[in-house]
Amino acid sequence: MSAASTAPVLSVAIPAHNEEHCIARCIESIAASARTAGQPVEVVVALNRCTDGTQAVAQALGARCVVDDTRCIAAVRNAAVRATSAPAVATLDADSWMAPGTVAAILMHVNDPRTIGGGTVIWPERMSIGIFFSLLSIAPYVIRRGVSAGMFWFLRESFDAIGGFDESLVSVEDVDFALRLKAFGRARGQKYGTIRRHGITTSCRKFDQFGDWYLFRNPRLVKAIFEGTNQRAAEGFYYDIER
């Protein structure tokens, strides 16, 4: 992402399980956004039980890779963040990609002393009536908590202060992280922010696999996933998925 002699001002931490078909687009979007911002950005990929070419693709694009084979996405996210070197960090899933203005937006917000960190608006790569209603079935679980997720951005010191992602959770570790980051900021007189104009786009591979209406038609599954500790629900929707 930058010359070796230039210290990064932002690190992007990516968890990856067999993502050779997606991660190039993700990393390339970060590089393009960093060039637009004119700032050095580091990419760290945490490889999780990878049996494909994820590592080779990521390293060829300048990313640094670490390995964490724990069957827990929170642990993998933590491994990626803890391997970063910049004072500011963003987390991004391997099947998502930044907009050209995302890096600049992150740096503007994360260095604002009034803000503790935050999330982003997430745009699906495609839309259908089924996806719309499936997203509506998820929205109440997030909106009522007053946080955004998708791609988190924060100072590394804030991440360390709240202990990172909760590794006792098998799902919705992202929402839990957002709530704890928000509470940490509130205690310091800081607000939780959302990057809206320069958000991220994410793949619809879950909908491609399960069907666009799947979440809408399975409200019990949605509820179970948002419990955070339902192993069976998490394994069926996340951990046992072949790529």
Task: Kindly label every feature range from the protein language model.
Residues E19-A34:
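Short, well-formed alpha-helical segments that are part of the catalytic scaffolds
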Residues G53, A94-M108, L179:
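Acidic donor-binding/catalytic loop of UDP-sugar-dependent glycosyltransferases
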Residues V89:
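Short aromatic/hydrophobic "clamp" motif used to bind/position activated sugar donors
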Residues P100-G130:
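Conserved donor NDP-sugar-binding/catalytic core segment of glycosyltransferases
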Residues Q39-R49:
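Short beta-strand/loop segment that forms part of the nucleotide-sugar
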Residues D68-T84:
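Glycine-rich, basic loop-to-helix element that forms the pyrophosphate-binding segment
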Residues V9-S11, E42, D176:
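Cell-envelope/extracellular polymer assembly enzymes that use nucleotide-activated donors
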Residues S29, L47-Q55, S96:
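A conserved acidic beta->alpha catalytic loop
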